[in-house]
A protein has these predicted regions:
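Glycine- and acidic
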Residues: 24-33, 133, 239-250, 297-299, ...
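Catalytic adenosine-cofactor/nucleotide-binding cores of aminoacyl-tRNA synthetases and other
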Residues: 253, 258, 280-434, 514-553
């Protein structure tokens, strides 16, 4: 049974007679909505579909938490200049998102609406239709006013519930001065207010703001306020009648937001908390960086749609249990994902799928209508993505030439069949895997040719003559490529030796044509391209030309970099508010210690990460760090750094990292690793 069906059955078991079930999700529009947040929507979406399959009415409720405070300015927004005379971005920290100006010239009235529209348009491309709630309007219209007053009346009980989940004891007077609501200041617009007193009926408060403003707030008339998160969340469960809501593993942890809010829902709002499903975060393979909407990295659903078809993105979420992590692949792992999806899709369409596979596909395929009471799905043409990438690279993604090549190799796909994947193949190759772009050399590669022995040179001459004479089909070309080494070397008795010589021949051809030791399947590559474009690159019967001599000079490698890497810097990042305080016990659990860098090596296919081998005083350990843009390996080897040694191991760029180094990162200085004086022994604790 698929996990979405299992959750749907539990929802029905709890409330068998409910007319309509509500599955919820929600996000703050802090920036472009990233793919980690999308798991919130996907999880609820699949449960809604499962409920409907079981004959129940269900809807997907989505809350835009646009009335939350702006905590920090995303990097990409901070780079946008404010109009002359307008206050800078960092002065909007503490404002609700809906009151922050729109950074972009797109007609949206505010910051929140820009990012909301961006996300909602992407959801249409997934065929996901939601019942949206805009929390600024919900709060400011007074819809929650009675529940705010109710929470104020119960503030002592709420404090006791919150306090029961804390490890440290409450300070004297803390309970009496606790108010579960934030007031947005009418003078400065921020939530930097403090309630000083509350009327006996809990409807009127006296408050002051950090800006110096003081005032009276009537909760029956003034609605520019918001309940604290762990009270607001259960209040909205009750208000909307929510039956199911997922959340990240931070909310799902013991004593986390859900555990606390569940108790508040029951004891304060007399509502049974919805079924909750925690989910793991999403990984990115082949790219690095913190995946956060406010970081400015823009790893959004819209970005993913440039690489994956919408059904594939939903498929990756649907086939994985919510508690299991999975990766979106920017490296060649994406080709394996396309292959796996195509196989499962074809099995489903041919009626060969089991119950689990059929449910996965029913969850991820886009419905276009209904026939005989069953959904009709958008047809997917399973043109092999790996082949499209290979051949597209060969013919520079020219559509008529691609159709011709597909026909030549016995797979006559038309543009109508491969158009949905064509731009995605080109985008992946050029943006994510430029090292796999195959371009013919402009001149003969004399440097490589002169390293070949006489037999290898003869092989190249035979291939040149065969291509020049023409008159072959695809199969004949493939056979000739394997036969040429035999013609030169004679019949070899040892199959392994023959295979080795044939492999070296193929490698030599690739090096002469595209400066690489491997490439697309050679017979396809040579057959797909017009011979006139490359046959001269195999002809070394004439002397080196002046252009070729000049190209050798131009292609001499630059001296090995020894100076410190220079990275463009900019204005300082906005200073962030101090984070939530931790107690001494929590701090003492962090094991920070001095480690010596023994090795520093590049990670294949990672543009920003090094693999560092360290000695921590007890043993060697490996960490991964995205400092490649800022330091050369020589600058790191032999240095002593500070590492969080008891951080749970995690995989980055295919390498398991056993800790994290400490560094200061700011737009004004780039990344500055914190080095320790060599006099400090390895293994020394930092406290």
């Amino acid at each position: 049974m698929h996990w979405s069906d299992r959750i749907a059955q539990e929802i029905i078991r709890r409330r068998p007679d409910k007319e309509e079930y509500v599955c919820a999700a929600g996000i703050s529009p802090s920036g472009s909505i990233h793919i980690g947040n999308f798991r919130d929507i996907a999880t609820s979406y699949f449960v809604v579909k499962a409920l409907r399959r079981q004959g129940k009415k269900a809807r997907l409720l989505f809350s835009w938490d646009e009335f939350d405070r702006l905590r920090k300015i995303p990097v990409n927004v901070a780079k946008i200049a404010r109009p002359e005379g307008e206050k800078p971005w960092d002065e909007y920290i503490g404002y609700p998102y809906v009151d922050v100006p729109n950074p972009y010239d797109d007609g949206c009235p505010n910051y929140a609406k820009h990012f909301e529209n961006e996300f909602e348009e992407a959801m249409e491309r997934f065929g996901i239709h939601m019942d949206y709630r805009y929390q600024a309007e919900m709060n400011r219209s007074g819809k929650y006013a009675q529940y705010v007053i109710h929470a104020l009346k119960k503030r002592g009980e709420i404090f006791d519930i919150l306090d029961s989940f804390r490890t440290q004891s409450a300070q004297e007077g803390e309970r009496e001065n606790y108010y579960p609501v934030s007031i947005y200041c009418p003078h400065c617009g921020r939530d930097t207010t403090k309630i000083l007193s509350l009327s006996d009926d809990c409807t009127v408060a006296e408050y002051e703001c950090a800006c110096g403003h003081k005032g009276t707030f009537d909760f029956t008339k003034d609605f520019n306020c918001k309940l604290a998160w762990k009270i607001d969340w259960p209040m909205r469960w009750m208000y909307e009648g929510v039956n199911f809501e997922p959340g990240g593993k931070d909310h799902a942890s013991p004593g986390g937001s859900y555990d606390t809010s569940r108790v508040i829902a029951k004891k304060i709002f007399d509502f049974e908390a919805p079924i909750f499903q925690g989910y793991e975060f999403i990984g990115i393979k082949g790219a690095t960086g913190k995946m956060s909407g406010s970081s400015g990295l823009n790893l959004t659903p819209d970005t993913l749609l440039k690489l994956y078809q919408p059904e594939m993105i939903l498929w990756l979420y649907a086939k994985s249990e919510p508690t299991k992590a999975f990766d979106f692949c920017f490296d060649d792992g994406i080709l394996r994902q396309y292959f796996e999806f195509d196989k499962q899709y074809n099995d489903f369409m041919e009626g060969k799928g089991d119950e689990f596979l059929n449910t996965v596909m029913a969850n991820c395929l886009l419905e276009t209508g209904e026939e005989d009471g069953k959904p009709v799905y958008r047809k997917i043409e399973t043109v092999p993505m790996s082949l499209l990438v290979q051949l597209g690279s060969v013919v520079d993604f020219n559509v008529p030439m691609l159709e011709t090549v597909f026909g030549k190799i016995g797979q006559p796909f038309t543009y109508e069949q491969f158009k949905d994947r064509l731009d995605r193949a080109k985008y992946w190759l050029e943006q994510c895997s430029p090292e796999n772009v195959n371009r013919l050399r402009p001149y003969r590669n004399w440097e490589v040719y002169e390293t070949l022995n006489e037999e290898e040179k003869k092989e190249i001459a035979l291939l040149h003559d065969y291509i020049k004479n023409g008159g072959y089909d695809l199969d004949e070309l493939n056979q000739e490529l394997y036969a040429i080494p035999k013609k030169v070397m004679g019949e070899l008795q040892d199959p392994k030796e023959l295979k080795k010589i044939q492999g070296q021949f193929f490698k030599n051809v690739y090096r002469l044509l595209i400066d690489k030791e491997k490439g697309p399947r050679l017979y396809l590559f040579l057959y797909a391209i017009e011979p006139e474009k490359y046959v001269s690159l195999l002809d070394f019967s004439t002397p080196m030309t002046e252009e070729e001599k000049q190209s050798l000079i131009k292609e001499e490698p630059a001296p090995e970099e020894t100076e410190k890497k220079q990275v463009p810097l900019g204005e300082p990042d906005p200073v962030e508010p101090i984070r939530e305080e931790i107690d001494i016990e929590e701090f003492s659990r962090m094991d920070m210690r001095v480690c010596k860098v023994l090795k520093c090596t590049e990670i294949r296919k990672s543009h920003s990460c090094y693999k560092l081998t360290l000695f921590d005083g007890l043993k060697e350990r490996v960490i991964v760090s995205s400092i490649k843009s800022y330091y050369t390996p020589e600058e790191m080897i032999g240095k002593k750094i500070i590492v969080i040694a008891n951080l749970k191991p995690a995989r980055f760029s295919g390498v398991t990292s056993e800790g994290m180094l400490l560094a200061a990162t700011n737009n004004a200085c780039g990344c500055q690793v914190i080095f320790v004086d060599d006099i400090v022994p390895e293994g020394t604790r930092i406290c």
